[in-house]
């Protein structure tokens, strides 16, 4: 489970909580449920109640996703093979902290130190697993907050482990910050222009729109930034600063591009089919630079150059 699902039918709790409650109603109380989650998800009390064993990623970025899923399976198989059955005790501590993912990398402090404490507690005698959830800040639901959980057979070890992690998280709450400089679009572009003008090195200057993030609940098709970029004079000429815009959904433009030769002109509207609150669909009139077919998700991808901007 990811812990980010939203539903108008589950405002008081969580879709994941309702989902696991219904699973429990089918399989009964004797069957064990081992749950693996994203550390940026939310863990409602109901989800915690019906999960016998629960764990989540210990790294952000989530380079340990498969490892975490494997751990959830290993925990389940171990309890079954050993005959120990369900862990006797479970601690669920909601922590009143709400942080976006961009502030919770485990590669830098304080996230690094906090998550380094998880494994020793999870491996301690009497504990089956321990986990820290940062939570999902953009969910707009009562369960939006951090959570610490431990499960095991030794009540004292389970309680003390959870309290130690929760207290460590709380003590470091003011230390979390963005892992990269943050500013306005205009300021970021000025920095990019100065970077290019001074030719500090040949590395690209990357600007990330953390607001319209489809992996965090955003539509992924907001056109506000693209519309602003297309109006900037420096990018009007094809000889201007090279800018790669990655990316914007545009099924209508895709259809036109598939019937166009590379190097020819192509046009079509892109974006704002899901979220048009801040900017409408944008009409791209440019040169078709590339077509890629076969991506399992996008199916077809194209690059259209407008001025010096290459839009994927």
Predicted ranges, named:
Residues 99-312:
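Hard-cation-handling environments
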Residues 35-52, 253-258:
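Glycine-rich, charge-decorated loop segments at or immediately adjacent to ligand/cofactor-binding or catalytic sites
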Residues 1-6, 10-11:
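Single conserved hydrophobic/aromatic residue that forms the stacking wall/gate
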Residues 14-20, 221-225:
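Charged helix-capping and loop-helix junction motifs
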Residues 25-32:
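A short helix->loop->beta-strand "cap" motif at the edges of active sites that frequently abuts
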Residues 5-6, 29, 49-51:
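Short, structured coil segments at secondary-structure junctions
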Residues 53-70:
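Acidic, His- and aromatic-enriched active-site or binding-groove loops in soluble protein domains
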Residues 80-111:
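Internal, active-site/partner-interface "lid" segment
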